[in-house]
């Protein structure tokens, strides 16, 4: 899940630009690329940025707070734990967590950055079930105050998301994202 505007993947990396939060991630040594019971580092892309100084990564890759998450950065990448992203958990567990995280008393959708139209929430899956298949149609949900209820008729993928974030941050496209259309127009972002 990502709360945007922004793209940590291509932004000039600084603590003012991006924050990566990992649900049930390790404390203190967040840059360690190790698996714990409910956390896997592969879901936090910033851990693999080799040009980011270790001290910066430690400051910008943090455990997901149990209460309010701060939405003060241009881009916040939010990674649920394996139970709440349905890798190891059930759809009911993931739904309950997402409902509380987005719509609960301190949920993202009740916070000023969202209600004022400064935040969009993207929810998508990187693979289907346990197969790891990325070719299957996968859920890709965009939530923002300006996004109407609609279904996209064209295929969307990770590059569509990256292109959208780059556009929202006014950054140049990189790699394969340069060859796809973003989502700003169809989703009124």
Regions found by a protein language model. Name each.
Residues 1-189:
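N-terminal pro-sequences and low-complexity stem/linker regions of secreted or lumenal proteins
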């Amino acid at each position: 899940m990502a709360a945007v505007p922004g793209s940590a993947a291509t932004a000039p990396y600084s603590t003012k630009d991006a924050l990566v939060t990992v649900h049930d991630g390790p404390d203190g040594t967040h840059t360690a690329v190790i698996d714990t019971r409910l956390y896997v580092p592969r879901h936090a892309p910033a851990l693999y940025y080799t040009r980011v100084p270790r001290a910066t990564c430690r400051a910008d890759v943090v455990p997901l707070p149990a209460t309010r998450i701060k939405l003060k950065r241009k881009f916040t990448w939010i990674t649920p734990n394996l139970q709440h992203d349905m890798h190891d958990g059930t759809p009911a567990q993931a739904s309950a967590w997402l409902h509380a995280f987005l719509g609960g008393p301190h949920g993202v959708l009740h916070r000023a950055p969202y209600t004022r139209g400064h935040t969009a929430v993207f929810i998508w899956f990187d693979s289907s079930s346990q197969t790891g298949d990325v070719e299957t149609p996968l859920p890709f949900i965009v939530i923002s105050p300006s996004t109407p209820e609609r279904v996209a008729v064209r295929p969307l993928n990770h590059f569509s998301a990256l292109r959208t974030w780059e556009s929202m941050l006014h950054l140049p496209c990189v790699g394969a994202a340069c060859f796809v259309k973003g989502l700003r127009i169809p989703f009124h972002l």
